[in-house]
């Protein structure tokens, strides 16, 4: 990651419009049970989610790349509960204490097969990108549709990037928007005008430096996706 940054001239570093989120996906034991121990199926689902997230964030001038995939095949490293406040805090503490020491990354997402309490399907801290503890989200894998999982993950990462839920004045070309307060039956791949403004306001005001540097191609573990030069590097 640092080498890739060093290989660019100062002018390239200044004028590169993109931010880069290096993400680790963590899959819990309930997911392993849900997919009958089929780790290849789980990996493929996670790779597709990462690639879909990257496509969604391109319009925000972001690249989202998977630099780590951890599957808790034997036992969970934290207690995953339906209580989202408890689980989010537990995952954040584990990320700060253990995961950061094992793998350099900017953001971590826990994907679980348990059913969160109430109607919640995702939960994250707001405005926390690059924080050593709070740059995390938790996601319930409730739908068999791969795109739905990616939309929820993009939504929760959006909260990490300082984006709040859309209101009636936000739009994204007539489609349902990613940061809507609830997921639509036909989930969209687009962020709203409000999301764009809030995200870049957060970046300008808080300067989360961990997303400034372009990762090395060798750090990216998700398979190439046609038309995406970063993933094919």
Curated annotation (Swiss-Prot):
By what means is the activity of this protein regulated?
Answer: Inhibited by PMSF and EDTA. Slightly inhibited by Cu(2+) and Zn(2+). Not inhibited by aprotinin, SBTI, Ca(2+), Mg(2+), Na(+) and K(+).
InterPro entries for the chain:
MetalloPept_cat_dom_sf, Peptidase_M12B, Reprolysin_adamalysin
Q: Name one GO biological process term.
A: proteolysis
Q: Where in the cell is it found?
A: Secreted
Molecular function GO labels:
metal ion binding; metalloendopeptidase activity; toxin activity
PANTHER family per the record?
ADAM A DISINTEGRIN AND METALLOPROTEASE DOMAIN (PTHR11905), DISINTEGRIN AND METALLOPROTEINASE DOMAIN-CONTAINING PROTEIN 28 (PTHR11905:SF32)
Protein name as it appears in the record: Zinc metalloproteinase recombinant fibrinogenase II
| Organism expressing this protein natively | Deinagkistrodon acutus
